[in-house]
Amino acid sequence: MKIMVINGPNLNMLGIREKNIYGTFSYDDLCKYIKDYPEYKDKNIEFEFLQSNVEGEIVNFIQEAYSKKYDGIILNAGGYTHTSVAIHDAIKAVSIPTVEVHISNIHAREDFRKVCVTSPACIGQITGLGKLGYILAVVYLIEYYNK
C-alpha cells in the first residue's frame, strides 16, 4: 500500500510555532513517528512525506499521487483547509481516498477555522488528536482497503 502524506503551510515549523497548540515535536519527528508506528509496521506500507507552503505545489502533489498510483492520501492542508477550492478540486479530480488531518481541534478555535473548504472532498476528517490523528488516518486507510 502506498500512502502520500501531504502537509501544508507552516507545518515545517512544528516544534517552533505555538507549542501550546501544536506540541513540541518537529516536522521530522512527525514523519518518523508516522513511518515507524508499530501498529502497522508489518503491513508493508510505503510512505511519501511532502510539505509545502505554496497552494499550487500542494495541488501538484495531489496530482502526482494519481500519476504515481498512490492508494491513499493523508492531507493536513493547514490554513488552506479554510480557503482552497483548488485543493478541494484536485482531491475530487484524482479520486484517491483522502483523509484530512489537523493536529489541533480546528472546531474549537477561531471562527474562520470552522469553515472547511477541502473537507467535503475527503472521505473523512480527524481533528484535535495531535500527531495521533495521522496514525488513525493510516489505520483507517488500511481498513478502507480491507473492507
Swiss-Prot record:
Active site: 22, 102
Pathway(s) this gene product operates in, as recorded in its UniProt entry: Metabolic intermediate biosynthesis; chorismate biosynthesis; chorismate from D-erythrose 4-phosphate and phosphoenolpyruvate: step 3/7
GO biological process, one term: amino acid biosynthetic process
Single GO MF annotation: 3-dehydroquinate dehydratase activity
Site (Transition state stabilizer): 17
Gene3D superfamilies per the UniProt record, alphabetical: Dehydroquinase, class II
Group of enzyme by EC: lyase
Any coiled-coil regions, as ranges: none
Keywords assigned by UniProt, alphabetized: Amino-acid biosynthesis, Aromatic amino acid biosynthesis, Lyase
Residues that coordinate or bind substrate: 76, 82, 89, 103-104, 113
Cross-referenced HAMAP family: AroQ
Quaternary context: Homododecamer.
Function: Catalyzes a trans-dehydration via an enolate intermediate.
Protein family per UniProt: Belongs to the type-II 3-dehydroquinase family.
Protein name: 3-dehydroquinate dehydratase
Organism whose genome encodes this protein: Fusobacterium nucleatum subsp. nucleatum (strain ATCC 25586 / DSM 15643 / BCRC 10681 / CIP 101130 / JCM 8532 / KCTC 2640 / LMG 13131 / VPI 4355)
